[in-house]
Amino acid sequence: MSKLLKNTAYYGIVPAVPKVVSILLLPLLTMHLTSVDYGIAGTIVAYTTAIAAFSTLGCTAFITSSFYHYGSHYKIIWRQVYGFLQYWMVLFAILQSVLLYFIIPEEAIENRWLIIILANFNNVFFGPSAILGAMYYRLNQEPKPVVFRSLACGLITVFSNLIFIVYLESGYMGWYISSFLGTFCINASYWYVLNHRLGLKPSYILNLKAIKHVLKVSLPTIPHAYSTYLINGSNKFVMDRANTPLSAIGQFNFASEFMSYFELFASAVNSAISPMFMEELKRGNILASHRIFKQSLVFFSIAVCGFIIWSREIFLVMVRNEDLSSTYWIASILVAGFIHRPLYLAVTSAMFYYEKTASLMKISLTGGLIAFLGYCMCIPLWGITSAAIITYLSFLAIGYLGYVLPSTRKLYILPYKVWNIFIALHALLVVAFFIMQTPLYIIVIFSISILILLNKIRNNL
């Protein structure tokens, strides 16, 4: 438990500091941003994330598995992957530039070329270095080099937002400039470490047989990664195609920001759990893997229900924009789906360890298709609230499909029956949404009671 808490703290709490600062700055930032600004950013993101799954061709899956299966020789194959990604990133940048040229909204057309340059520069020159550098430290369970880089990048981005949005009144462009500055710093630092300190330089003479094996493992994960877009990004694409007002897209995009905070939390827990989980699978220690699963279940339940219960008060205090402050219900529905994430993390970790990435495609694509088809049918009729509900149902699907599909249900056996977990988590959500609508004093009393209860049972976690 202590190791999980320590690694989660490194991967989650430290990098979350910029997010916390960003949240604290919301009252100031939302005074200088409009729902149209959020709509412009949301529309562009909806299209760029449509191809983001192809940016690495899924090579991170092979990077992970090769670390465990190739022993001390993994760096040899990593150099091949490094060189291959250097070539690929140039082609991907060309593809993304063409896409951006045509889809940037009319309201942002004057900044078209600057947006294109800012969106592609870092990936072309430092993208592969950042991927391999972060994976090296993470797989060696050395979180500090990763998280403190993330902290520095985040703080640079947040305070750049303050300068460009609040003081220079740059509107939506403040996000793009700030993101470029922060990403440049972190990616360039990985390039130096990877090439000079670790001596892991790219091999530009590619071994086609080796690359073919890399792609055999990696390409099936693209639908898995693409499902993230279908769930999180295609909703704004459908809104745009359905001629949803840009201000409404902006409201949904703002609510989605809180979902992105939970994505950071989920990524942190995954970064902490996955190496530990795979290590226990390697040892054949099922009881230890069950303990890790239970701990993650508690983490996510507390975080999700806590946000839902306090969302109304958070938006009331932090959001100084009437159009945006009313979206706390949408944000709560979007965040609710994360309560099922531990089930997904457990079965996908087993898939990556056993290199069963083809099975992962079934789960991811199913969840993604449920989302996309649901958006297409519901958004034109019922608007942005229906998009949030469909997102929740998609998270629900990918959380449980791995335990019901014949090809994957035996990869990892849960410590409890799946149906019991399903009922218990939904009971928690019902209580959380009920408490959210009660007066503040009831919310405070309920929260204190839960904290006291957790303190009593923490030794059993």
Describe the residue ranges of each PLM region.
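Helix-loop junctions and terminal segments of transmembrane helices
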Residues: L26, S55-S72, G199, A255-G284, ...
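Interhelical loop/hinge segments that connect adjacent transmembrane helices in multipass membrane
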Residues: M1-L4, R112, K144, L168, ...
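Membrane-water interface segments that mark the loop-to-transmembrane alpha-helix transition
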Residues: K6-P18, I44, T49, A53-I104, ...
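Alpha-helical transmembrane segments of multi-pass membrane transport and lipid-handling proteins
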Residues: Y82-A108, I163, A266, H290-R341, ...
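Hydrophobic alpha-helical transmembrane segments
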Residues: V147-H196, T366-I370, I384-L405, I423
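Membrane-interface junctions at transmembrane-helix termini in multi-pass inner-membrane proteins
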Residues: F125-F148, V335-T366
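Transmembrane helical elements of multi-pass membrane transporters/channels
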Residues: N7-S22, C153, W175-Y190, L194, ...
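Signature of the first transmembrane helix
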Residues: K3-A61, A93-S97, N123, G154-V158, ...
